[in-house]
Amino acid sequence: KGARENSGEVFGFSLVYSGNFVAGTEVNEFHISRAFIGMNPFDFNWRLNPGETFTAPEAVMVYSGKGFGGMSRTYHRLYRTRLARGTFRDKNRPVLANNWEATTFQFNEDKIIAIAQKAKEAGVELMVLDDGWFGNRNDDTTSLGDWFPNQEKLPNGIGGLAEKIEGLGLKFGLWFEPEMISPESKLYEMHPDWCIHAEGRERNLGRQQLILDLTRQDVRDFIIGFLTDILKNNPISYIKWDYNRNFTDIGSAMLPPERQSEVAHRYILGLYEILETITTAFPNVLFEGCASGGGRFDPGQMYYFDQYWTSDNSDAIARLKIQYGTSLVMPAIMQGAHVSAYPHHSLHRFVPMKTRGHVAMTGQFGYEFDLSKATDETIAEMKEQIALSKKIESVVHFGDMYRLDSPFETDCSSVEFLSEDKNTAVLFHCCTLGKINGAPHFVKMSGLDRASEYACEETGEVFSGAVLEDVGLAFRHSKDFESWIYIFHKQK
């Protein structure tokens, strides 16, 4: 009660689980508060035979006496250093370009190469081929499960394209949606019982697709098999693992009626088995999960995925709230954030390139528009953005995050990233709504060494830590969608 971003007592509860859950608080007749989080009991039963064990998901409880910010920083450090694992845990990630918002399903090898050439010119390090490369996948109604290259689009196959991308000096990444199946696919023709479904009922589609039944060993073997084959036989450095719908009609043809309430949890156990197998077999592949459109971004996924596409809404101004809210528990190093098109392809908002870049730099930085059409001016600006991203990424990804201005409460957003030794601070500020003759907005920093002096790299000005925290920096909000990034270095 009464807790704020930087003050008050906060109790945080987070579940290391990717399945159905329930969380809540209640007060009993003696005015005692109770908080709970765990597996959702709705439609869940589990037969536990003599001698068997059942392991419930872990709940991670955090106490903070320094408000929501203190809670978040505890979660960030804990999950980044103790839950995340693997080759990339303590490394900065490559700057990537993804073709999805540039082409959707309509592309060929020449188009992808054209995007990659401009990406390389700008300094991008990884080219990702998204949805549409397999089967007869020309829209979202078909071919999930048919994981072989579309010869019309890619006459030289995945391997041929990947070699050309690598020949440009880029790494190559590939999109999959391994957990899904299209009713219009060769896989469904052969195995119509392989999807999650309730016997005797119509199978309801989400995004024109069904979910594979991961409770089945044959389905898990199939997924592990095709992923292993493609990763072994092609120079792939990155996998984007999508998940575009959630559950309906939960049931499995493999379980008897009295055990159908085990399906949802068994699915998650099956998913974890697949992810454990694949990520262990290919430790040098960077794996990125996707929160949209199935709405799955949780600590259970963080154990397997190096980073996560935070939302399919890539509009920079919308992302201020999305990334702010996600940061309550998830660290910046986990949040995929890309520079999208001008205007944005779905919101049609005109956000300057500078601001789109700044917003993306507060997460895992990349690009998501048609680079093949980029002008020399755009390429030059991209080079500057990538250079700035490289300069600040270690502080953003491995430092402490302080939320200073909430986009939910003000017409701006401010976030500070502070290195562990407090020697370097990165301040991001964005105005979402300009004002005529408005008073300056002061952004007060946090976590600094108050007795030391900090020099601003961009302006050359020197401030004490106490002044930066108690008075702050003044910003004029003279126009919409303007942003700033300032870097501060503690003086010896």
Residue ranges and their predicted role:
Residues 125-133, 223-256:
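Active-site groove signature of glycoside hydrolases
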Residues 182, 187-221, 265-372:
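Glycan-recognition surfaces
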Residues 464-492:
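C-terminal beta-strand-rich structural cap/linker in extracellular carbohydrate-active enzymes
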Residues 5, 406-449, 487:
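Carbohydrate-binding surface patches
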Residues 51, 97, 127, 165, ...:
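Conserved, mostly hydrophobic/aromatic
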Residues 354-405:
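Catalytic cores of secreted or luminal carbohydrate-active enzymes
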Residues 88-225, 238:
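Aromatic-lined carbohydrate-binding/catalytic grooves of carbohydrate-active enzymes
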Residues 1-72, 76, 83-84:
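Catalytic and substrate-binding clefts that recognize carbohydrates or anionic sugar/phosphate headgroups
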